Structures are given as structure tokens and as C-alpha cells.
Amino acid sequence: MKLLPMDIPRVVIAGTSSKVGKTMISIGLMRLLVNRGYEVQPYKVGPDFIDPGFHHLATGRYSRNLDSFMLSRSAILETFIRNFRGADVAIIEGKTGLYDSSDAVSEKGSVAEVSKILKAPVVLVANVERLNRTAAAIILGYKLFDPDVLLKGVILNRVGSERHAGKVRTAVEKLAGVRVLGVVPRKKVKMPYRHLGLVTAYEREDMDELLDNIAEIVEKHVDVDKILEIAEKAPPLDSVFEDEKEDEEKKYVKIGVIRDQVFSFYYQDNLDELSKYAELVFVNSLTDKRLPDVDALYIGGGFPEVFAEGLEKNEKLRNEIYDFCQSGNPVYAECGGLMYLGESLETSEGEFEMVGFLPLKTKMYERFQAQGYSVYRTLKPCIIAKRNQKIVGHEFHYSRPTLTGKADFAFRVERGFGIDGRRDGILKENTLGCYIHVHFLSDKSIARRFVKKAMKKK
């Protein structure tokens, strides 16, 4: 065990609610600092997959999810400190509102809780469109609600004019006693959204231009030097964790990971955990015609409904995956991966044939079918968990499955929805397909068990 007292310049960019401009400010700040020569390590509070993709493109470093519902305090500190190595400053993007939590009463799962675990100063982004004095009341409420949160300033977004900006700035600084660190005009830039949130970074061909444009806006309208000063004054962190050695035998196990514009929802920490014990081989579901020589397969979530026609057309790979599953090789699929392993996927464009291994069809709906954190209990041993093991994760999808035959389930739903409101995790041969997204740092035995199952098939 090692005690690591570390001075890590860090700041949380939080929001008064969703869609107030947190992502724009965060990635603009990241990109601007990179352009100035800083090595920026990005983080995302919460379970989101899409924002970290933008973080990666803005900084060149993989973003890490810090979620206090799924992860313990020690796990959050471990991934935060371990992945900061080699960086100059940490920019931590929040989620929803600063104090929004998993149960709306405690601070569990909130940005505020994570900021306190990290002893990180907070800069709040607020939408002040059509507000002046009321903005001060809102900001004062955030300041007083939890004195242990290190609220160091606010960025006022979507102001209508210079006159409006002056009024709101004066009100917030005089009446709320919070320093204004930026005033951003409305309609400067608009981030593209889809039903799960932002459109993925994979789908933007103009990403460099977009990121540089956002960085210019941040540079012009935000006091970046002051934010850096706030980050540099963050108190030291003490964290205790073990330095784990990679398995020297990992070269004998290969895990295929389908990672492309279709299936891009992977926690980087999950891939890192697997890579401690196995070699990862990446597969493209649209362009690769054959599976590489691997011992197991991991299919994450994403947007198969957007690329359903392309998935259907790649019949050779679908057949390869079917045969791989049928042969009893370990296959773990989450959400979009579950949909892909089913028989078909129905969208507004029609019904498309999928791999056809699992006995279900899925259909897309305009409204979400499940959203939020999930807690499961394992009903029977599977490739990622032993019997009666607690599994924590989250769900967010607009699809609904229909079973087409008898299904064996791995998990009982204690919180969440799963496949039918009571169960999740269809088991067939050595394949597990579920709606829940699991962070492997919530229980490190998950990755180890999956790799051991792959080793047994060799």
C-alpha cells in the first residue's frame, strides 16, 4: 500500500442543471489549455459515455468517469490520481445540477459529493437568459446549500447583451458574493444533441474546427487565468491504493472489443482493467468481415439503431459472431451490444437483421424506456459474476425488447428496469447480454472473472 500526498491542480466545471453549457465550457477550456501547451487530464462526473469522447478529442487523453453511486470513494481517488500522471491540470466536467443525486435527498451520486471526495474547487455554469437579480438568488442558494462545497466562482451563460451582462454580473457579485469568472453570449455555439444526449464525437467530421471555435469563445469570454489559479490552489490529496502489476501471462489471452462509431460506449477504466490480464484486439462492426483470433468478445453500448442498415449489410461478421457465441466462447454485451446479438432491430427506417444469437427482438421508441442507476443481484454464476454478487451500474436506452423464445437470466433487478422490469442479463452458452452498463472499478473481480473464463476456453 502506498500513501500518496499529491498537489494536483484541479477544478470542477459544474452546472445549475442540464443543458446550461457545462460541456461547451469544459471542452472549450480543455482545448484552450492544450493549445497553450498544457497537458490536460479530463474527467466526467457520472456515468455518461458521450462527453468523455469529446474530452478525448479536445485533449488527446482518455477521460475518466468519476461516479460516486457506482464507485467507492477509494476507487474514485484511485482512478483520479492514477490517470493524472503526466498531466498539468485536471478539468472535471459535472453532470446535471451540482446537487442532483441518485435519490434526491442524500448527496449520493452528485457532483457535489465527488467534488468533496476530490477536495476540488467548483466553478458553476448558470443559464441566466432573461434573468438579472433572480440569478443572484439562484447562485446564493447554491453557495449556501452546502458550505463544504468549494464554490469559487460562476460563469454566466447565454446573456443577451452587454447591458444584460453588466446587470447580472453586478447582481451576482454584490448580492450573492460569488465571483463572476465569465459571461458568455447566447447562440455563440450549439452542441448537437440526440436522444441519449450529445451526438458522439465519432460522428463529427469537423471536430477539430468545432473544438477550436469553442476554445476561442472561452478565451474571449471567460477568465481562464483565474480558473487556472483556482485549480492550482486546490488542497493536496491523500490517497491510499495498491500499485497493481500487469499479469505477465496476459499475452496468452486475447479479448476482442467491438469499438467503432456504432459501439463506442466503453469506460476506459474497463478496458484498462481487462488489459492488465489480456491483450485487447479491436474490431469494427461495419468494415471488418471476420473476427480476429480472440478468446472472448466484449461488445459495449452505442447507437446500433443509427447504423442498423450497415450492421445488417455486414452479414459475414454477423455470422462469425454467431458462430463464436455458439461455440461457447465468452461474450459480454451491454445495451447496444445486447441489441446487436438479438434477432432484429426495428427503427423508424424499418426492421434490420442482427446477429440472431439471443432470443429477442428490439424496437426503438421516441421516449426513453429506462433511465438511471441500477442495482442487480446475480441469480446464477455467469462470466462476470458469481452467484448472489451485487452488480451496480446504470441504464439509459430508448429501445424495448421482446423475447422470441425461452430465456435464462443472470440477474434479478433490485433497482432499475433491465429487460422486463424484473430481470436482466440473458444467458446462452457462454454469452451474457444485458441492458446495464457496468463500471469494472465498482468490483475488480468482474474483469478478472471475465478473463479467467476466456483462459478456460483456450
Curated annotation (Swiss-Prot):
Annotated site residues (Increases nucleophilicity of active site Cys) in this chain: 437
Occurrences of domain GATase cobBQ-type (ranges): 254-445
Keyword Nucleus: no
Known EC number: 6.3.5.11
GO function terms (MF aspect): ATP binding; cobyrinic acid a,c-diamide synthase activity
InterPro entries according to UniProt: CbiA/CobB_synth, Class_I_gatase-like, CobQ/CobB/MinD/ParA_Nub-bd_dom, GATase_3, P-loop_NTPase
Metabolic or biological pathway, per its Swiss-Prot or TrEMBL entry: Cofactor biosynthesis; adenosylcobalamin biosynthesis; cob(II)yrinate a,c-diamide from sirohydrochlorin (anaerobic route): step 10/10
Reported cofactor(s): Mg(2+)
Active site: 335
Domain notes: Comprises of two domains. The C-terminal domain contains the binding site for glutamine and catalyzes the hydrolysis of this substrate to glutamate and ammonia. The N-terminal domain is anticipated to bind ATP and cobyrinate and catalyzes the ultimate synthesis of the diamide product. The ammonia produced via the glutaminase domain is probably translocated to the adjacent domain via a molecular tunnel, where it reacts with an activated intermediate.
Full protein name: Cobyrinate a,c-diamide synthase
Organism of derivation: Archaeoglobus fulgidus (strain ATCC 49558 / DSM 4304 / JCM 9628 / NBRC 100126 / VC-16)
Taxonomic lineage: Archaea, Methanobacteriati, Methanobacteriota, Archaeoglobi, Archaeoglobales
Gene this protein is translated from: cbiA
